[in-house]
A protein has these predicted regions:
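N-terminal intrinsically disordered/low-complexity leader segments
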Residues: 1-35
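Hydrophobic alpha-helical connector segments
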Residues: 85, 99-130, 180-187, 207-210
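Amphipathic alpha-helical segments used for helix-helix packing
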Residues: 110, 123-148
Length: 224
């Protein structure tokens, strides 16, 4: 600066440097891509829950997620690719809920745990459940192309139940006369059917129904 002469530094101890808050780490390209995909899928989930898949457009998903109209197309290719990814996204959400729940041993105890988590969801608008049921219902229509993807999604859930039914039979807590495949269809169908009714009629007492479903599962599966 002008007019400033050199001076001797004052003989005082300079204050210790206060550690600054660490600057936010710059995200990697992979992290940014993963966040974009998650936001796109969450936006698609909300749209499907509200209006279904038939009128869903990739441009609308991109805009709803806060990105360009073309990003969803760039990421998923087409509508079928988006819906396939959305089914996987719903699976991951449920798996996250299961991991957050108390750990259960395999067999009948694990089946109880899945029922409790299924009925204990905290999403106030039931967006995920509503979107899934809409996708399954619309999968019955040929023009949506959803049937194969929804059947594959169901097989994952059925396989999980079958695994625990077989484990329960081996452990001696589930009857050896129980057919794992049939029992799994019964369990999954019961859960999905109750949720469909609940979305149509919010007055249904899900806590009471949950207790009844747990008791029914015990009675129908337990070794006699």
């Amino acid at each position: 600066m002008t007019g400033r002469s050199a001076v001797t530094a004052p003989a005082v101890e300079p204050p210790a440097e206060t550690p600054c808050a660490a600057a936010p780490q710059r995200r990697t390209q992979t992290q940014r891509r993963e966040e974009a995909e998650r936001r796109l899928l969450d936006a698609a989930l909300a749209i499907v829950a509200r209006t279904g898949t038939v009128r869903l457009t990739l441009a609308a998903v991109g805009l709803a997620a806060g990105y360009s109209r073309g990003l969803a197309t760039h990421r998923f290719g087409n509508k079928a690719g988006l819906l396939r990814a959305l089914a996987a996204h719903i699976t991951v959400k449920f798996q996250d809920q299961m991991r957050a729940a108390p750990r259960r041993r395999s067999g009948l105890d694990a089946i109880r745990g899945h029922i409790e988590v299924y009925f204990g969801r905290t999403d106030r608008q039931w967006t995920t459940t509503r979107a899934l049921l809409v996708m399954m219902t619309e999968g019955l229509m040929d023009q949506t192309g959803l049937q194969a993807d929804m059947a594959a999604y169901n097989r994952q859930a059925l396989t999980m139940f079958e695994t625990h039914v077989r484990a329960g039979i081996q452990q001696g807590e589930i009857g050896a006369d129980i057919d794992p495949a049939a029992a799994s269809v019964m369990l999954l169908g019961t859960l999905r059917g109750v949720m469909m009714q609940s979305l149509l009629d919010p007055d249904i007492d899900l806590a009471q129904v949950r207790d009844s479903v747990l008791a029914m599962a015990e009675r129908s599966l337990a070794r006699r």
